[in-house]
Amino acid sequence: MSSSISIHLWICVLVFLPPCYPGLDYTYFEDDGLIIKKTDWYLHLKTKKLDDHIRKVVKNVERREGGYEANFNDHLSMDIGSPEHGLLIDSQLSEELYSLYVHAQIISEASYSIRRDECPSWKAAKDLRKVKLDKTSMGEMCLSLYYNKSACIGMNLKYRSPDGSCNNLKRSFSGKATTAYKRLLYPNYSNEFNEVPEEYYSDYRPSPRILSVAFVKDEHSPDDFKTMAMAYWTIFVGHDLSHTAISIMMISNRPVRCCHESRVELNPGKRYHELCLAVKVPVEDLFFSNNVRCMYYGRSVPAVRSDCTFGPKEQMNQATHYLDGSMIYGSSAKRTWLLRTNLDGQLLTSMGCDNKSHGDPLQPQYMPLEDTESNACQYGSGTCYRAGDIRANGLPQLTVMHTLWMREHNRLAKLLSHVNPHWDDERIFQEARKIVTASIQHITYAEWLPALLGENYTRWNGLELPTKGYSNAYNETTDPSVSNSFATAILPFANSMLSDTISLYTEHRVINASLSLREHYNRPTGLLSNYMDQLVRGLSTQNTQKIDMLFTQTLTNYLYSAHPIHEFGMDIVSLDIQRTRDHGIPSYSEFRKYCGLKAIRSVQDLSKIMVEGSTDRLLKQYRDWTDIELLVGALFEKHEDDSMVGPTMRCIIREQFIRTRMADRYFYDLPNIFNEYQLTEIRKVTLARIFCDNSNNVTMMQKKVFLIPAMADLQLCDSQLIPKININHWSEMVDTFKK
């Protein structure tokens, strides 16, 4: 191991901040030599001992990664356009987060090192959560991230920060991008800290690919009442709330290769790299039959615990934890800056086929082409769009949704500048962003959640918003963090709602053509300029697929495959199951207990709550019902009344969106966010109006775009039945006159 590598990593760990940072809140931490309590085994963990473990881990990382690069250097490069490249695009770690990632990974490994050497007990993980980092070499970094008293000084707190910081004025880090997902239940790791349980590789918890093949069918299963807009709004909102990244090499910043280019094991018969958790493909797999035995999966990027302690591994959310439009504007100041014109509050646009910005209102506007990052587009620079979230390009109609909201921002910015000609670029941008964010929140709670969970359920379970006046729902003690179970095991239900066939519709909702999702995955640029309006009508007309275990092969066999170059792709169900294991998500039965649902005590109990025919299939793969994983159980669960999901999934979704609202100081219906006239206008917003105002030339739309329309439901976009907001209520002169 070269000394230069050692110095590089150790400097990265230790020189995060100067030794004494004046803005840090040291009063939060106890100042005793033994750290925390005076009882139990961790009494003896003095700072020197903790730092010894940290140093040992750093040396182990240097040795491990140096040896890995020496042995497999020829196989570490990732082919541009490959399925692995496609996955890395969706899950890539932002450059500015690299240092945080390295710290979190070392703390995670040091936690296990302490447990192994100091207390080989099965309760050690919970004990170590009481041991603070503050006096160790990692302390300054964690304190600066979570307990920096000066973090909000100098910020314009009238508007949201790009990264979600300073929403909570007492805990500036709360809900911030780069912080950890929240645990609803204690994580399930085999060593209590970071390892996937060994039983996942035994006979009763087989490879995720075996489960995918056993459970998933590619059959048409349309929902008779809901449109494809349900699927894409789910994904759109999911990307606003969560973004999990894949770990990379901590010294070279290169991807960790788990599989050979030929997609066999890179290191057969031996332990994978610490950051690898490749999906094993069985020999008898009928699709991957041509020597494909390995599906790439890199472990998720860890996060530093918000209480600055050692303990079990947590995963980082790169997105802000708030419903704040971060998929449009980005989750960092840097990303937001890359999307702005810095003129008249506008977001950057392009003509769709080149990257020239234009101001001609008669020409359709598209998001700017991504030509700055060579690896950001699967098919090369300039073949995808730049958005607040890098995942905007995978699904054509998701790209449409991003385009509509980019246009909505610019439309509002233009109107605001007209009624307030004295406003500068920054004021126009922030006010337009504020209206866009409020509109997304209103559509999510007033239209999408009732359609997903059922109107009666949302009404009687704390999810219905007031239709008049202000709410008093904000609670500064509520944690806004997106739950790990929601992001990892529940949100993937949206993938089952997709179809390989993308139907294109005329103005009168007649299908005149169709496209294949497989042929256009990650290839959005030419598609939008040719089919924008047909795709918008498709969102509001084509039936979404039911939420179940039926998935298109585009996602289970051909995911990220560059058609027709690559014969095989990846499997989204296998990857999602593997991610739940990587994150230590407890079982389906444990979450039924959490939700207060009836416990499963027999095969008969299981049969009553699962869809017909699924119980035998489940117990053929799992030893018993206690081993069924949350993602699998939730997708097989019977739906309730007018809900699109089962009771366990509904419970976890409800828990998330109650906190998402209560913990947001900027939620749109709180006092001092909008005046009473403006709030009335926000409550008029519908997704139908967004489709009407921001398509190229759609002239008819149903008022409720999440519901399948009859011809009688279609209204002219100019109709008062699809109301418009009156931007004059944002004129400062008008407000002054009324007062």
Located regions from the model:
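Secondary-structure-rich domain cores
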Residues: 409-411
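Alpha-helical bundle segments that constitute or directly flank the non-heme di-iron/ferroxidase center
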Residues: 395-407
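A positional/structural detector of protein chain ends, strongest at the extreme C-terminus
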Residues: 1-4, 738-739
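Terminal regions of secretory-pathway proteins
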Residues: 18-396, 414, 419-739
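Cleavable N-terminal signal peptides of Sec/SRP-targeted secreted and luminal proteins
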Residues: 4-22
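A generic structural signal for short
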Residues: 2, 401, 576-577
